[in-house]
Curated annotation (Swiss-Prot):
Disulfide bonds: none annotated. Keywords: Glycoprotein, Membrane, Signal, Transmembrane, Transmembrane helix. It comes from Arabidopsis thaliana (Mouse-ear cress). CDD domains: PDI_a_ERp44_like. The gene is APRL6. One of its GO terms (cellular component) is membrane. Residues 23-161 form the Thioredoxin domain. This is 5'-adenylylsulfate reductase-like 6. Its main location: membrane.
Length: 295
């Protein structure tokens, strides 16, 4: 009988311990994998930490696209494309952080201009900085309004259909010093991108551009050589001078020489007229003599 009671007590203790462990296991969060630990969240569809904005690059953009895929629970993702050299980007970043508080169910990603390729910016329709985009599995919506809190909240609500938190909280945080009422943008920074970044980020595009430029130079080089030779010949002729052009120039520059030439021409004409008159008189006298002799 005592053995049965002992066995029964052991069974009760074992069952109690198992139930306690099961309860503890239910209350403890599951262990994160190494990938989840590195990425900073367990579920791709949940970035619910208030004010959490992920700094990303091309890989994070691909992850954001995967998060809003139809197979996942996340409906929308917010993207901020900014540039560190752009003052308007520094003004809009605090407002973007605040929007991640208001819409904590929407993952927010901040993408710096130098961390992505130019083709990626073109893909997302980024033509200036800063640019705020809301995207889902079927569309990208670019925000083009002012940067006041009311305007941003209206944009988020219209696109996502998600209502904000307490209106009184929004009212208290409406006048944030970093907000700017006008939608200024820094132009697309092609000139600001260093050749090193272009070569590293757009290797194929850079090599293709260099090839096209070299090919164009090869095609126009014969024409350029002919043009240079022709120009050099003209310059040499202008320096040495043509004898005929030199004579004409001297003739125009020296009036004495021109007057002497004019006098010589007049004397030649007078001499020629006198010679013709003498010849005509001689012929007339000889003809009159022959007529008288015949009579």
């Amino acid at each position: 009988m005592e053995k049965k009671l002992t066995l029964l007590l052991l069974v009760v203790v074992v069952l109690f311990v198992n139930l306690t462990n099961a309860t503890v296991r239910v209350q403890i969060c599951p262990r994160e994998s190494a990938k989840d630990y590195i990425l900073g969240f367990r579920d791709k569809s949940a970035l619910h930490r208030p004010g959490f904005v992920t700094e990303g690059d091309d890989r994070w953009l691909q992850m954001a696209a995967d998060m809003v895929d139809k197979k996942n629970k996340c409906d929308y993702a917010a993207l901020l494309f900014y540039a560190s050299w752009c003052p308007f980007s520094r003004l809009v970043r605090p407002s973007f952080d605040l929007m991640s508080l208001l819409y904590s169910s929407v993952p927010h990603f901040a993408i710096e201009e130098s961390s992505v390729k130019a083709s990626t910016l073109s893909k997302y329709g980024v033509h200036g900085f800063p640019t705020i985009i809301l995207m889902n599995s079927t569309m990208l919506v670019v925000y083009r309004g002012s940067r006041t809190l009311d305007s941003l909240v209206a944009f988020y609500t219209d696109v996502t259909g998600i209502e904000t938190m307490d209106e009184r909280w929004v009212e208290r945080n409406r006048l944030v010093p970093h907000f700017h009422a006008e939608p200024e943008n820094c132009p697309f920074p092609w000139a600001r991108r260093s050749p090193e970044n272009l070569l590293r980020q757009e290797t194929y595009l850079t090599l293709a551009t260099v090839f096209v430029l070299l090919r164009l130079l090869h095609l126009i080089s014969p024409t350029m050589v002919v043009f240079v030779k022709f120009t050099w010949g003209r310059v040499s002729n202008m320096r040495l001078g043509n004898p005929l052009e030199h004579t004409v120039t001297m003739y125009l520059k020296e009036p004495c020489m021109s007057s002497n030439l004019q006098e010589g021409a007049m004397n030649a004409r007078a001499w020629a007229s006198k010679s013709l008159a003498t010849v005509s008189i001689a012929e007339s006298s000889s003809s009159s003599r022959s007529v008288s002799a015949s009579q």
